[in-house]
From Swiss-Prot:
Topology versus the membrane: Peripheral membrane protein
Primary location group: membrane
Enzyme class: translocase
Entry function: NDH-1 shuttles electrons from an unknown electron donor, via FMN and iron-sulfur (Fe-S) centers, to quinones in the respiratory and/or the photosynthetic chain. The immediate electron acceptor for the enzyme in this species is believed to be plastoquinone. Couples the redox reaction to proton translocation, and thus conserves the redox energy in a proton gradient. Cyanobacterial NDH-1 also plays a role in inorganic carbon-concentration.
UniProt keyword terms in alphabetical order: Membrane, NAD, NADP, Plastoquinone, Quinone, Thylakoid, Translocase, Transport
Gene designation: ndhM
HAMAP family per record: NDH1_NDH1M (MF_01352)
Protein name (record): NAD(P)H-quinone oxidoreductase subunit M
Location within or outside the cell: Cellular thylakoid membrane
Reaction equation(s) it catalyzes: a plastoquinone + NADH + (n+1) H(+)(in) = a plastoquinol + NAD(+) + n H(+)(out); a plastoquinone + NADPH + (n+1) H(+)(in) = a plastoquinol + NADP(+) + n H(+)(out)
Domain of life of the organism encoding this protein: Bacteria
Amino acid sequence: MLKCTTRHVHIFAGEVTADNHFVPRDDLLTLDVDPDNELVWNDAALQKVYARFEELVEEYRGRDLTEYNLRRIGSDLEHFIRSLLKQGEIAYNLQGRTPNYSMGFPQIPAEEIVGQYIPKG
């Protein structure tokens, strides 16, 4: 099974069926965004990620479906998600199971931080 996994993007060559089974396919990609819920999403931001994914897939149309090409798409999406975070369209989930500031420390006013330690830097 071909796949690409980054911190916030999982892409699989195949589909998930109604009974929650995965069926590998060479003609369909499945995208899972932020599977660990590290970020706080709104519908508009998610739609931007899905639209960017569709654009990237279209750019690769006609090329071989390889792990390398999937990684390029996943990496580009990861950078796109980082840009959404930096623009304030999404935010870190400070109540998440495992806070990991993999895209840089949160940019929020200190008075809004309750029970969280964020080093000055």
